[in-house]
Design a protein with these regions (language model features):
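N-terminal, intrinsically disordered, basic low-complexity segments enriched in Arg/Pro/Ser/Thr
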Residues: 11-14
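Pyridoxal 5′-phosphate
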Residues: 17, 21-415
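Extreme N-terminal basic, low-complexity initiation segments
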Residues: 2-8
Length: 415
C-alpha cells in the first residue's frame, strides 16, 4: 500500500511538472513576442507573471495546510498569507491589518458600499457617486436605492472628470459615503482622489475609491489622500484571477461580509485562497518595483499610437483626458465605423482590443461612460478601447495601426 502511494505521488508530481514545463514554454513564447496574438486588452485582464506562478506552486502541491490550524505545517500557510498582506500594505503605505482579502474587485466594491452603509445606518442614508463608475459600484447602488437609500450621481465633464464644487455641494447631513473610482476602466481618466478625500474628511463622510484599474499604474499613498476604503483586483496587475483585496482604514465602521469562521479578523469568513493570496502579494511587489519605468515606457507607446492614428486616419476622436490619464489607456471613436465590426476585423488579424469594459462587452446598450461624456449613441457604438501592458512592443503597435487603417477604410466604404 505504501509503495503504491509513493508511485501515485511521484506520478502526480511528474504530471504537474509536465504541465508547468508546457506552461512556461508558452509563457516564454508570449514574453518574447512569439505569440500569434497581439494582446491589447490589458484593462480586461493581464497575463500572470512567471515569478508569480512559481511563488504560488508550492501552495497547490506541498504547502497545502489550512492556515487556521495550529500545527507548524499550517503556520507556514498562515505566515505566507501574512507576508502577502504586508507586501500589499507596503505598496499603499498602510498597516497590514488594514488589508482584507476578497475574491476580486467586484466583491471588494460590494463589501465597501453595502457594509459601510449597514454600519452607518443610524447616521444617514445618502451616498454620492459619479455616472461613470464600474457596474460593480453602480448596480450595487441601484440595489441600495431599492431598499431606501438615496444616491446622488455626479455628472462628469467631456474628459470624464467630476467637479469638486458639485461634489461638495451634494454633501448633506445624511451623507455617509462618497464612492468615486481612482481611474476609469474605459477612458483611463484619473480622478482627483486626494482632493476628494480632503473634502470627505472635512465633512465627516467616508470615502471609498475603486482602484482596480489604477493600482500598479500610478503611485497611490493612501494616508495622504484620506481614503477610508480602497478596492483592487489581482488579475489587473499580473496576478491570478479570483483574488483581490479591500483596504479598510483602521476604525472605519464596516460590517462583516460573510458569517462563519474567524478569518480576516472575523469580517470575511471562509478558508483563505492561500495560493492566490501569495500570488497576488508577489505580483504587487513586482509591479511596484517596475512601475516608474513602465509608466514612462507605456506612456511613450500610448502617445505614439494616439499620434499616428490621429494623423493617419481621418475622423478619429480621442475620449478622456490626455493629461490626467492612465499610461496604458487609449479610447478612440472612429466616426462612421461600427466598433464591433472593427473589433471583429482586428480579431481576424489576431489583434485583441475591446469595445468597452470586458464586464459589459456582451450588452447591446451603448457605454454608459461614453454617454456620460456627451457622445451620441452612434459615436459610442463607433468606439474601441486599446490598453497596453508590460509585454506590448512598438512593433506590435505598428502592425495594429496598419490594420486599423485598412479596416477603417474598408468599413467606411461599406457604410
Amino acid at each position: 500500500m505504501i509503495v503504491a502511494d509513493i508511485i501515485l505521488f511521484r506520478f502526480s508530481i511528474d504530471i504537474m511538472l509536465m504541465f508547468l514545463h508546457s506552461f512556461f514554454l508558452i509563457y516564454e513564447r508570449v514574453g518574447n513576442n512569439m505569440s500569434p496574438y497581439i494582446y491589447l486588452d490589458y484593462a480586461a485582464t493581464t497575463p500572470m507573471k512567471k515569478e508569480v506562478m512559481e511563488e504560488m506552486l508550492p501552495y497547490f502541491t506541498i504547502q497545502y495546510a489550512n492556515p487556521s490550524a495550529i500545527y507548524e505545517f499550517a503556520r507556514k500557510s498562515k505566515d505566507a498569507i501574512d507576508t502577502a498582506r504586508k507586501n500589499i500594505a507596503i505598496t499603499l503605505g498602510v498597516k497590514p491589518q488594514e488589508i482584507y482579502f476578497t475574491s476580486g474587485g467586484t466583491e471588494s466594491d460590494n463589501w465597501a458600499i453595502l457594509k459601510t452603509a449597514e454600519a452607518m445606518k443610524n447616521k444617514g442614508n445618502h451616498i454620492i457617486t459619479s455616472k461613470i463608475e464600474h457596474h460593480a459600484v453602480l448596480h450595487t447602488l441601484g440595489y441600495m436605492e431599492s431598499i431606501g437609500y438615496e444616491v446622488t450621481y455626479l455628472d462628469v465633464d467631456k474628459q470624464g472628470k467630476i467637479s469638486l464644487k458639485e461634489l461638495e455641494n451634494a454633501i448633506k447631513k445624511e451623507t455617509i459615503l462618497i464612492t468615486i473610482m481612482t481611474a476609469n476602466n474605459e477612458i483611463g481618466t484619473i480622478q482627483p482622489i486626494y482632493q476628494i478625500g480632503r473634502i470627505a474628511k472635512e465633512h465627516g463622510v467616508l470615502f471609498h475609491t475603486d482602484g482596480v484599474q489604477a493600482y500598479g499604474h500610478i503611485p497611490i499613498y493612501l494616508p495622504e489622500c484620506s481614503v477610508d476604503l480602497f478596492s483592487a483586483s489581482g488579475h489587473k496587475f499580473y496576478g491570478p484571477k479570483g483574488i483581490g483585496f479591500l483596504y479598510v482604514k483602521e476604525n472605519t465602521p464596516i460590517s462583516s461580509l460573510l458569517k462563519g469562521g474567524s478569518q480576516e479578523r472575523k469580517l470575511r469568513a471562509g478558508t483563505e485562497n492561500v495560493a492566490s493570496i501569495v500570488g497576488m502579494g508577489k505580483a504587487a511587489r513586482l509591479v511596484h518595483q517596475s512601475m516608474n519605468y513602465e509608466r514612462i515606457r507605456e506612456t511613450n507607446l500610448r502617445n505614439y499610437l494616439i499620434h499616428r492614428v490621429m494623423k493617419e486616419i481621418p475622423d478619429v476622436k480621442l475620449n478622456g483626458s490626455m493629461k490626467e490619464r492612465l499610461c496604458n489607456n487609449i479610447n478612440l471613436t472612429f466616426r462612421g465605423v461600427e466598433g464591433e465590426s472593427l473589433l471583429i476585423m482586428l480579431d481576424s488579424e489576431d489583434i485583441c482590443v475591446a469595445t468597452g469594459s470586458a464586464c459589459n462587452s456582451k450588452e447591446s446598450t451603448p457605454s454608459h461612460v461614453l454617454m456620460a461624456l456627451g457622445l451620441s449613441e452612434e459615436e459610442a457604438y463607433s468606439t474601441i478601447r486599446i490598453t497596453i501592458g508590460e509585454m506590448t512592443r512598438k512593433s506590435e503597435l505598428d502592425r495594429t495601426i496598419e490594420a486599423l487603417k485598412l479596416s477603417v477604410a474598408n468599413l467606411r466604404k461599406k457604410s
